[in-house]
C-alpha cells in the first residue's frame, strides 16, 4: 500500500474534492488565489488527500494544481485525468513537485455509459484500463482508478475492471455512485461483493464517492464504509455537480458522534470545520443554507420553548455534539471603533485568518469604517468583512461611491461611481425601486448581457444596525455565477454582490474546459 494507507482497519481517509468536483457546480468557479487558500485550509485541518483540480481542463487549472502540489505540506495532492494518455501525462506533470502526488484516472463502466457516451465494448474498456493505469503508475506511485457509474454496472463486469486496475498498479479503487442512484443497502452490498470476489482486492484501498440526487449521499457513504471502503470522497458544504456531493463535515461528524455503531476514525481537526465552511462559501459565493447539518446558521439554534428549557438544564438534551467541536464559538462584543491593529490582528487569528500585510491593512481599514457606522461589531461582522475583502482583492470593477434617492413619490434614482480597470466613471439611473435603480446604474457603467436569476438578502447579525448580506446569481449564456456582498446598507451590499458576480464573469471569460467534463 501507499503512504496514505490507513494505519489500522478503523482509520478512514478523507479525500476532499471541493477544488475539483465542488468547483464543477454551476457558478462555483474559484480564482487561483481562492483555490490556494482553500487548499491551505484543507491541508491544515488534516485532510488526507486534496483533489486539486482537472489539469487538462485549462492552463489555469493546471497552474492551480501545480502550485497547490508545490505548497502543500502534509496532504496527498491529486490531479484528475480521463482515461486518455494526454490527460494522464498532464496530471502527472501537475503533481510532479508534490511531496506526495496522486493521479486519479477514471473511465465509464456501466452499459448505458458504454453504449451512449463511450461507444465502446466491455473488452475495449478493459484494454483502456490496462493501458492508462499502467501509464499513470509509471509516472507516480499513488494511482487511483474510478469506475464511473459503478452503481449501475453489472457486478461481474465491475469485478473484472477492478481486478485489471489493481493488476496494473492502482493503489486506490473508487466505486462512485455517480448519479446518486443507489440505496445504502445496495451500496454496502456492492463493496462487500467486489472485495470478496476480486482476487487482488487486498492490494488496494477502496473508496466511496456519493452524489446527493436522492438525498442519500451521507447514508451511502457510511454504508460504503461498512462495506469495507476506507476512503471517503467528499466536499466542504456538500457542493458539487447537480445536487452536490457528500459533505465532508457531515461524514466526519457522523463518524465521530456515532462511534458507538460506526467504529471508524478520521484525522480531521473538527474544530476547523466551520472556518473551512465559511471560507468555501466566500470563495464560491454559495451561501450555506440555514438548516444545513453541522455548519448551517441554525445547526445549534433552539427556538422551541421546550427545547430551550432542556438546553438550559443540560445541553445534551437537544445537542448531540457541541458547537465548539466544529469551531462554533460564542459571539463576543469586544471589537469597536477604539480597537487597534494589535487587537484586530489577534481577533483575526482567533477566527482562523492568516493575512498578508497588505491584506491585513485593507481589512483593518474596512473594519474601522464599519466600526464607525455600527455600535457593536460581532465576530460574524468581521468574518463577512474579511471574506469579502479576500474575494474582491483582484476585481477589475470596484465600487467607489453610491447615492440612492428613494421614497413614496418621485423616481427611485441611483448615482454610482466605479473604478473600472483603473478608470473612474459615474452614472445615474432610475429604476422600479431602489435596488432596480442600483442595478440599472451598474448596467449603464458596465454594459453586459448577463441576466439576474437570484437576489436574496439576510442579516449577518442581530439588531437594526446589522450588516446585510446579499446574494446575487447572474447568468450569461451557458455560464452562471453566484456572488455575495455585505454592508450595513442593504443597497450598498446589493451593489457589491452584483459587481462581485460581474467580476467573476469577467475573470472566467477565457476559462477553457475539457471537451468532456469529469462528472464523477
Swiss-Prot record:
Tell me the segments the record calls region Regulatory domain.
398-520
Q: What is this protein called?
A: 2-isopropylmalate synthase
Which is a Gene Ontology cellular component entry for this protein? cytosol
Asked if the keyword Hydrolase belongs to this entry, the reply reads no
EC main class here is: transferase
Record-annotated membrane-spanning stretches? none
Q: Do you know which HAMAP family this protein is assigned to?
A: LeuA_type1
Q: Which organism is it from?
A: Methylobacterium nodulans (strain LMG 21967 / CNCM I-2342 / ORS 2060)
| Domain Pyruvate carboxyltransferase as annotated: residue spans | 12-274
Amino acids binding Mn(2+) = 21, 209, 211, 245
User: Under which EC number(s) is this enzyme classified?
Assistant: 2.3.3.13
Query: Reaction(s) catalyzed by this protein?
Result: 3-methyl-2-oxobutanoate + acetyl-CoA + H2O = (2S)-2-isopropylmalate + CoA + H(+)
Biological processes annotated in GO: L-leucine biosynthetic process
Assembly state and interactors?
Answer: Homodimer.
Amino acid at each position: 500500500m501507499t503512504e496514505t494507507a490507513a494505519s489500522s482497519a478503523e482509520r478512514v481517509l478523507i479525500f476532499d474534492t471541493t477544488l475539483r468536483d465542488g468547483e464543477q457546480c454551476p457558478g462555483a468557479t474559484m480564482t487561483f488565489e481562492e483555490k490556494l487558500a482553500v487548499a491551505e485550509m484543507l491541508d491544515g485541518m488534516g485532510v488526507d488527500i486534496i483533489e486539486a483540480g482537472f489539469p487538462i481542463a485549462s492552463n489555469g487549472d493546471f497552474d492551480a494544481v501545480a502550485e497547490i502540489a508545490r505548497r502543500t505540506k502534509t496532504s496527498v495532492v491529486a490531479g484528475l485525468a480521463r482515461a486518455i494518455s494526454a490527460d494522464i501525462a498532464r496530471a502527472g506533470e501537475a503533481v510532479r513537485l508534490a511531496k506526495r502526488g496522486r493521479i486519479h484516472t477514471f473511465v465509464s463502466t456501466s452499459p448505458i455509459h458504454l453504449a451512449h457516451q463511450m461507444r465502446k465494448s466491455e473488452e475495449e474498456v478493459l484494454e483502456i484500463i490496462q493501458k492508462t493505469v499502467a501509464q499513470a503508475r509509471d509516472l507516480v506511485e499513488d494511482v487511483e482508478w474510478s469506475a464511473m457509474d459503478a452503481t449501475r454496472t453489472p457486478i461481474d463486469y465491475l469485478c473484472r475492471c477492478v481486478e485489471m486496475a489493481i493488476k496494473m498498479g492502482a493503489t486506490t479503487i473508487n466505486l462512485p455512485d455517480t448519479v446518486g442512484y443507489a440505496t445504502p443497502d445496495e451500496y454496502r452490498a456492492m463493496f462487500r461483493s467486489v472485495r470478496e470476489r476480486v482476487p487482488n482486492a487486498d492490494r488496494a484501498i477502496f473508496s466511496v464517492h456519493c452524489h446527493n440526487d436522492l438525498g442519500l449521499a451521507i447514508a451511502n457513504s457510511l454504508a460504503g464504509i461498512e462495506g469495507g471502503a476506507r476512503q471517503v470522497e467528499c466536499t466542504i458544504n456538500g457542493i458539487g455537480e447537480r445536487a452536490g456531493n457528500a459533505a465532508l463535515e457531515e461524514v466526519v461528524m457522523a463518524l465521530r458522534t456515532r462511534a458507538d455503531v460506526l467504529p471508524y476514525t478520521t484525522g480531521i481537526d473538527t474544530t476547523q470545520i466551520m472556518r473551512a465552511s465559511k471560507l468555501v462559501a466566500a470563495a464560491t459565493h454559495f451561501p450555506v443554507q440555514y438548516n444545513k447539518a453541522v455548519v448551517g446558521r441554525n445547526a445549534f439554534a433552539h427556538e422551541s420553548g421546550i427545547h430551550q428549557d432542556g438546553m438550559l438544564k443540560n445541553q445534551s438534551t437537544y445537542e448531540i455534539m457541541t458547537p465548539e467541536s466544529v469551531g462554533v464559538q460564542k459571539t463576543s462584543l469586544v471589537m469597536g471603533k477604539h480597537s487597534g491593529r494589535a487587537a484586530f490582528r489577534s481577533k483575526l487569528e482567533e477566527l482562523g485568518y492568516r493575512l498578508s500585510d497588505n491584506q491585513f491593512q485593507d481589512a483593518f481599514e474596512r473594519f474601522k469604517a464599519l466600526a464607525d457606522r455600527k455600535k457593536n461589531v460581532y465576530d460574524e461582522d468581521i468574518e463577512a468583512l474579511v471574506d469579502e475583502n479576500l474575494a474582491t482583492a483582484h476585481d477589475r470593477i470596484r465600487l467607489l461611491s453610491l447615492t440612492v434617492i428613494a421614497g413614496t413619490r418621485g423616481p427611485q434614482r441611483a448615482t454610482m461611481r466605479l473604478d473600472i480597470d483603473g478608470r473612474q466613471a459615474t452614472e445615474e439611473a432610475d429604476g422600479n425601486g431602489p435596488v432596480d435603480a442600483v442595478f440599472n446604474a451598474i448596467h449603464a457603467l458596465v454594459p453586459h448581457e448577463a441576466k439576474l436569476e437570484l437576489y436574496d438578502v439576510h442579516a449577518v447579525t442581530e439588531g437594526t444596525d446589522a450588516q446585510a448580506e446579499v446574494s446575487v446569481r447572474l447568468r450569461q449564456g451557458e455560464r452562471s455565477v453566484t456572488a455575495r456582498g455585505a454592508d450595513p446598507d442593504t443597497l450598498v451590499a446589493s451593489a457589491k454582490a452584483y459587481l462581485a458576480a460581474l467580476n467573476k464573469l469577467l475573470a472566467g471569460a477565457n476559462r477553457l474546459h475539457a471537451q468532456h467534463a469529469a462528472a464523477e
